Amino acid sequence: MSQLIFIPLLISLLVTKGKIRFLNNFESVLALSLHYGILVLALPIFILLYKAKKQPCSILLKVTTEPIILSAYATTFSTAFLAITINALFGLIIAWILVKYEFTGKETLDAIVDLPFALPASVGGLTLMTVYSDRGWMGPICSGLGLKIVFSRLGVPMATIFVSLPFVVRTIQPVLQDVEEELEEAAWCIGASPWTTFCQISLPLLTPSLLTGTALGFSRAIGEYGSIVLIACNIPMKDLVISVLIFQKLEQYDYQGAIVVATIVLIASFGGLLIINKVQLWKQNLSK
């Protein structure tokens, strides 16, 4: 195992041809950056995949087909998809308002968007509980509509919506700022309605960033733990998600099961991001 830990480092040394002089030229900076990225990102992922590969096939098959795990996967991905679908719509609207309009409190709204980035996950979960519990501000209203947010399955998408919204807004906002207003004004001059202008001019330009934001938000929603463990009841076959399930397996000293489940989530998240990047490149090539 100790030899495997140094394999990525050896690869990086070969790529840079052993030129590791301390920041005295571009190659040294590149080598240092490559080593840092491998140590921080690639090495933990590599070790996790290596641990999963060492598991017998019988254990892999048993773990991946357990009803509780299949239910947790279904809950995780379905609620994350629901959350990011809602955030794709409202995140686009919020980014549009922040860029296109001037109003009192704009700076405050712009700062609030980043709150999920700054808040600890447990604080976010406690905030949602305070708002949506039976004695919270929105709890009685939701109860009157027949909706129970806290300690129910609805708490999972509510938590993932909260943590993933900034990814959509912040990836769309800079692209929207760079869209030339002359294009929209030209469309209006030839009689196009605002909706037609948005659909045929603005939206195609925003699609790559929208896809990136939704992919990042989806990955963030899949991995959310701190707020979900507080706002949901985390009951198997009901609202248990993968991140909480992994922690429960570690508490039960089921390290093999935790590694297998975590590896599947890792592969799924990486595959989703890879597909989104391919789609972006394809759209960029079409636009040229």
UniProtKB/Swiss-Prot annotation:
Location in the cell reads: Plastid, Chloroplast membrane
Query: Membrane-crossing residues?
Result: 4-23, 29-49, 79-99, 111-131, 149-169, 227-247, 257-277
Task: Output the superkingdom of the source species.
Answer: Eukaryota
What is the topology of this protein in the membrane according to its UniProt annotation? Multi-pass membrane protein
The molecular function GO annotations come to: ABC-type sulfate transporter activity
Keyword Cell membrane: yes or no? no
Record carries keyword Chloroplast: yes
GO-annotated cellular components: chloroplast membrane; plasma membrane
Q: Which UniProt keywords apply?
A: Chloroplast, Membrane, Plastid, Sulfate transport, Transmembrane, Transmembrane helix, Transport
Ranges for domain ABC transmembrane type-1: 73-276
Protein task = Part of the ABC transporter complex cysAWTP (TC 3.A.1.6.1) involved in sulfate/thiosulfate import. Probably responsible for the translocation of the substrate across the membrane.
Q: Which family does it belong to?
A: Belongs to the binding-protein-dependent transport system permease family. CysTW subfamily.
What is the protein name for this chain?
A: Probable sulfate transport system permease protein cysT
